[in-house]
Amino acid sequence: MIDTLPLIDGGPTHRLMQRIGLLKQRGPELARGALVLAVFAWLPMLVLAAAAGHLTGGVPVPFLFDYGVHARLLFSLPLLIVAEVVVGPRLGAAAARFLERGLVKPAEVPRFEQAVAQALRIRESAVLEVVVLVLAYVGSFLSLGLSFSFQVSRWDVLVTPGGPRITMAGIWSTFVAVPLYQFLVYRSLVRMLNWFGFLWSVSDLDLQLVPTHPDRAGGLGFLGGAHRPLGVFALSVGAVLSGRYCTEILYGGSTLAAIQAPVAVFVAVMVLVCMGPLVVFLPQLMAARRKGLVEYGALALRYAAEFDRKWLRGGAPADEELLGSGDIQSLADIGGSFERIEQMRPVPFGLKDVTALVAACLLPMVPVLATVMPIEEVAKIVLKVLG
């Protein structure tokens, strides 16, 4: 029996991180590795900013008060490392269940294996990871260019009469910290796209769905649960936005009302990104539902007619009692199966899966509330929502 198909859990970078001890399966060791990488990216900027007098003052935006940087490197970056260990195995196990549960018909197994092979080729592509690294540096230089356009000195870029000038802390940020973070983000997106491509290929197969399956998704309900760990990625992105909004509210004059719409858009986009790809199974699920309703409807009609003839029209043997007869239970079972088919979902995930993802998106926004209200009130709101 195949327990997992590691379609995204691997590749050159993954093996490198394993070799240097960043990726460990056990909690404490994994947390330690993630913390080491975060400190490697963040601590030199702290030291260099302090040496230049830009730690808590000296410029309008000193290092310690740039909450977006701290959220990105001390919270979001470690979460991306955690996601490397958490998400891959869950999705790999989900891929194996297509075969384990007989969802792939024997005639479709070769095409399923082709989809697996394609995903593995993408996972192992060193060229693709080099492209991701180049994009990370391009993104870092674009961020630096944006900083040069500001009219206010920051810990990373100073506005001088001769023009903007990058600081030593800014050099580390531009050439090490930001590219490292963006590489992990872009790589996570590539891994997700690889998985979504696999799902697209599988959705094109003639799957053996069971319309009466208790998961109300023809047997594909496990996919919704497998996508819940993607909430770690949503949590990571949300942390960056939270740091940015805290800075805007505390130093940019923004308000809580002004960020409500962007937060709502962020949540909607993350739900679409993390759960939207499962919609590719909608045509097959709806076809299975229609076919099931027709077949079980015909079966229920025949059985109900026989039940009617036997027990209401005098067709039952004289020595057979209705009480205790298995006919009633069989009629109820057929009715229950028909109702279950009627309740089939058009997608292989439910409200609980979406709710878990929304919670992961909103959890990092708690510090934003703390910028405009007492921490006690924030705690009450959080406890009320969780309760």
Spans of features found by a protein language model:
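Long, internal scaffold/assembly segments composed of regular secondary structure
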Residues: F183, R187, L193-A261
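Final/C-terminal transmembrane alpha-helix of multipass membrane proteins
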Residues: D353-K380
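Membrane-interfacial helix-loop-helix connectors in multipass membrane proteins
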Residues: L55-L64, S147-I171, S242-V265, E376-G387
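Long, well-ordered mid-to-C-terminal structural blocks that present hydrophobic/aromatic surfaces
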Residues: A226-L299, Y303
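Transmembrane-helix bundle segments that line or gate the permeation/cavity pathway
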Residues: M1-V210
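Loop-to-transmembrane boundary segments
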Residues: L22-L43, P110-S140, I171-A177, T212-G238, ...
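Juxtamembrane inter-helical linkers in multi-pass membrane proteins
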Residues: R97-A115, W155-G162, F196-L223, L282-D319, ...
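Alpha-helical membrane-embedded segments
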Residues: L74, W172-R191, V237, A261-F281, ...
